[in-house]
């Protein structure tokens, strides 16, 4: 019985991966659009015009590459309890890095992000 369900699950994962492989650009565009729409009403999203971005090229023009230091102020606001700063709502947790390059860093982790990491780990198995 377990083998049957494992086989059904594996086949569904393979079909899903095949769709991504067959249409990588379209898949990435859909994901970018979904993320931009979700974060459009956050402080970071409003400052960078997420609501008006329709293409990857527009995203590259409006959202500069940033380091942790560039985001530190946003992360501080989140740590102080402000909602909707980098992502809607508040994070479930803060991960603490070892700080090998420039001291300890705190990374906000959302429930959605944690669920995505769990799914990715499960899918790899």
Predicted regions span which residues?
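Nucleotide 5′-phosphate-binding alpha/beta core
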Residues: 1-96, 102-125
